[in-house]
Structure formats: structure tokens, C-alpha cells
């Protein structure tokens, strides 16, 4: 187990091999969506994005480029999105926190390629970043062919004016304004002042 970025939460690290095969076997997601919908809730499932998942994975055995697995992994995401759409889900949040890291150009290119392929899938997609600002990846994130972008204003409030300038008007902008990492109450008046700028 490894720490999830700079949090006190841990996750099981995926172990990846050059001949890795992927299949969709996680029914719990779809069962929980059905249950929530049956209770009358609007559902927005959250999944770890394909690039973040590969980035965090560990090579097992002989070294290889983890991005070589992307073309095998993307159809699984397509299956997930198709099944969620068939259940009546309108939006899916795709967490890509590695967009807040200093990424090699090869990974930036992979983001563009992956999301160009995923844009064909039937649900609306909100790419979410957190733990830091987008920095040099702001243009990349704003330009991805998705329906919305979530940014962290608690850790990186300085990115707000720039993202307002760069994000196309037809995209939804979601703002992380409540600090979930401490016990202190959020200053709602201050948050409202920030939100009114959008």
C-alpha cells in the first residue's frame, strides 16, 4: 500500500506487466448506481482516470513503458461509460490528479489522445484535478474534449482567474472550495465572494 499523493489515505498499487490484459469485472459500481437511482437520487459516479491509474501503477517484471497499455485500457473505460449511460447516468467525474504534476510531454500527449477517444462515449465527462494547481498543464486540461473541469481552489486559488480566461464558455467549471483536509469551518462568505467571480 502507498500513500494517495500527500494525504494520509492509502491505496493498493496496481501491478502492471507488459502483456497485461484488462477486463471489466467490478459490478459493485453498477449495483450502487442502480440502488441510488431507485431511491430517486441523481447519480454522478467518480472513477480514477486512465492516465492517473497507469501513472500510479507499478511495473512488475521486465521494464516497459506503462503508456503502452493505454490502448488496452481505454476500451474498459468505454464499457464503463456505456453501461452507466444505459443506467441513466448523465455525468461521470474522472479524477486525474496527475494533471497537477510536472508531466513528461509523452504523458501530456497521451491525455489528448485518450480523451479524444473517450469523447465518443455517451456520458458527459467532468475531469477533476486536486491537491495542487494545474500550473503548466492548465492549457492541456482546459483543452481536453470533455464537458467540464474541476479544479482545486483550496490548494491553488491563484489558478482561478487564469482558468476563467482559458476554459471555453461551453464547458462546466466545478470549483473545489471546501477544505476536506482539516476540521475548520469554511468561511462561506469568502467562498461566495470567490464564486461570484465566475
Locate the predicted segments by residue.
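Domain-level signal for soluble alpha/beta catalytic cores
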Residues: 1-198
Amino acid at each position: 500500500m502507498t500513500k494517495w499523493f500527500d494525504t494520509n489515505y492509502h491505496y493498493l498499487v496496481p501491478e502492471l506487466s507488459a502483456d497485461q490484459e484488462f477486463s471489466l469485472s467490478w459490478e459493485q459500481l453498477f449495483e450502487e448506481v442502480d440502488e441510488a437511482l431507485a431511491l430517486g437520487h441523481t447519480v454522478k459516479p467518480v472513477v480514477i482516470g486512465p492516465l492517473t491509474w497507469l501513472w500510479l501503477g507499478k511495473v512488475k517484471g521486465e521494464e516497459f513503458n506503462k503508456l503502452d497499455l493505454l490502448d488496452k485500457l481505454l476500451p474498459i473505460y468505454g464499457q464503463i461509460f456505456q453501461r452507466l449511460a444505459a443506467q441513466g447516468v448523465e455525468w461521470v467525474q474522472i479524477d486525474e490528479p496527475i494533471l497537477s504534476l510536472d508531466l513528461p510531454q509523452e504523458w501530456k500527449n497521451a491525455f489528448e489522445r485518450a480523451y479524444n477517444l473517450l469523447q465518443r462515449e455517451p456520458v458527459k465527462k467532468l475531469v477533476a484535478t486536486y491537491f495542487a494547481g494545474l500550473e503548466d498543464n492548465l492549457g492541456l486540461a482546459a483543452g481536453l474534449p470533455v464537458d467540464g473541469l474541476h479544479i482545486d481552489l483550496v490548494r491553488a486559488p491563484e489558478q482561478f482567474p487564469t482558468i476563467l480566461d482559458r476554459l471555453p464558455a461551453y464547458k462546466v467549471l466545478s470549483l473545489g472550495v471546501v477544505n476536506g483536509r482539516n476540521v475548520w469551518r469554511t468561511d462561506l462568505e469568502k467562498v461566495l465572494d470567490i464564486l461570484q467571480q465566475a
